Amino acid sequence: MRRFLLFALTAGISIPIVACSPKQQASREPVVVETLISATESWNGDSFKYPRGQAEMKLEKITAQPGFKTPLHLHPQPGIIYVQRGTLYCETSDGKSLTVAAGESFASSQDTVHYCENNGDEDMVVFVASAGAKGKKTTVTTE
């Protein structure tokens, strides 16, 4: 009986100490998945369609100095753009425009003529993910 009481007393003191351990209070999930964007059409309303041929996924990092402006161009495949640093400004040939700040993402236009520029005062860094076809250009200039 003494052994049982000693065990019960020891367990009764130990359990609250373990339960209040700093490691227990600071625990968190080992991984967190956060969807930054999920889209069925582009920012300007273009419907997505995949090009014919062998699928090719591409991720490009683009660094542009202040004042850089692309020529008029289009993208023949769906894509997603994430602005890591700076501000990206895009405008379509029909006058629709979009300004995207650092930390934001958007679904790029498809088959719509547009230009983009860094109109900020620091280098702009963007990541472009494209779902195209092997051997096909992801950007087609129209000028």
Regions found by a protein language model. Give the residues of each.
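Hydrophobic h-region of N-terminal signal peptides that target proteins for export
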Residues: T10-V18
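A short, N-terminal "cap"/entry segment at the start of jelly-roll beta-barrel domains
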Residues: F4-L5, I17-K58, A107, T141-E143
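Ligand-binding loop in jelly-roll beta-barrel domains
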Residues: D111-K136
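Sec-dependent signal peptide recognition
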Residues: R2-T10
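Glycine- and acidic-residue-biased ligand/ion/polar-headgroup-sensing regions
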Residues: H75-D94
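Histidine-centered metal-chelating micro-motifs
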Residues: K69-P71, Y89, F106, Q110-C116
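Short acidic-glycine-tyrosine-enriched beta hairpin
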Residues: A64, D94-D111
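A short beta-loop-beta micro-motif enriched in histidine and acidic residues
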Residues: P51-A55, G67-I80
